[in-house]
Amino acid sequence: MDSRPTIAEIDLAALRHNFEQVQRAVPAGCGILAIVKADAYGHGFMDISRELESLGVTAFGVAFLAEGIQLRKSGIDRPVLILGGVYPGQERKCVGFNLSTAVFSLEQARVLNDTAARLYRKAKIHVKIDTGMGRLGVAAAEAPAFFRELREMKSLELEGIISHFASADELDDDGRRFSDRQAAVFAQSVAEARSLGLDPRYVHIANSAAAFGMDLPFCNLVRPGIVLYGALPSGDFEGKMALRPIMRLQSTVAMLKWVEPGTSISYARRYTAPDRRLIASVPVGYADGYSRALTNRGEVLIRGTRAPVVGTVCMDWIMIDVTSVPGVAVGDEVTLLGCDRQGHCVRAEELASWAGTIPYEIFCGISKRVPRVYLNATR
């Protein structure tokens, strides 16, 4: 190995377990569109997608065209939905690579229709309805007129109708009421499309939280993301899901040294030893995605014992107070995220809490310079 002993192990057996949890949570016959955008939330979307395809996943969701093309070029032939839609000039590749795309304006629909007609193909689209997210989508009040126009575009295949919950991960009364209102608006839009003779193959609004927490009988597809990777949508789901983290970010102790009382550690001297302390230097830092916000807040696992990050997180290094770790030695494994060999875990939810963010950002932030090593693949 020419780099460092800092790697991210990806346990595909844990991915299979989490996928099975989704299967058990949704009604029989409901499809699963796995969200693999942003490099499968930092887990490596090629290997993740191949594993999910072997499990019989219905489809994949990506953010933009290039991600969809990468899946096709890697041999993935399941349906792939571009959740963010295509931009002007991308329509030909979208159709040519047999990718489906979200559509949220008539201009998008018209250009896709014209492009597909010239290619003697059908463009597969999912009409996105804005039911309350306020980000992308046809306004629900404008949906009937949109669908009427769509009926005249003969080179489009209405593969789906889609929306997105804004607060399905919030299980308080206000969050539930808003999600229920979104679901009702979406159901009405779907009914309006069908009353006009349109027959979408897929109807979907449920993300990870809604897949586990809501009854949506008019839908036949769910879109899990974060739960596949072993983290909860929010703290409201604590104890409600039997998930396993699939990423283990690990490194090793590179140096040990005793420091005397009053010794400062790292940039800006944000930590000063209160007494004689044993400090370990570990080759991982914010350039690897171990956030600087974890300065004097993070914890790691060494020999099954939790030990605190002390001093400012550097670009390439962190320092750990290992005074209380029995027998600690240079070369010992350090678990920064995920579970160690004894089953003790530092959860993404914990890192997110310490860093003032969410597990999604923790996963997505693990940088490309950290090699991914895949374990327990089925093929």
UniProtKB/Swiss-Prot annotation:
Keywords: Isomerase, Pyridoxal phosphate
Active-site residues, record numbering mapped to chain: 37, 267
GO biological process: D-alanine biosynthetic process
Catalytic activity line of the entry: L-alanine = D-alanine
Disulfide topology: none
Recorded metabolic or biological pathway in which this protein acts: Amino-acid biosynthesis; D-alanine biosynthesis; D-alanine from L-alanine: step 1/1
Residues the record lists as N6-(pyridoxal phosphate)lysine modifications: 37
PROSITE patterns reported for this sequence: ALANINE_RACEMASE
PANTHER family (alphabetical): ALANINE RACEMASE (PTHR30511), ALANINE RACEMASE, CATABOLIC-RELATED (PTHR30511:SF0)
Official protein name in the record: Alanine racemase
Organism: Geobacter metallireducens (strain ATCC 53774 / DSM 7210 / GS-15)
Gene: alr
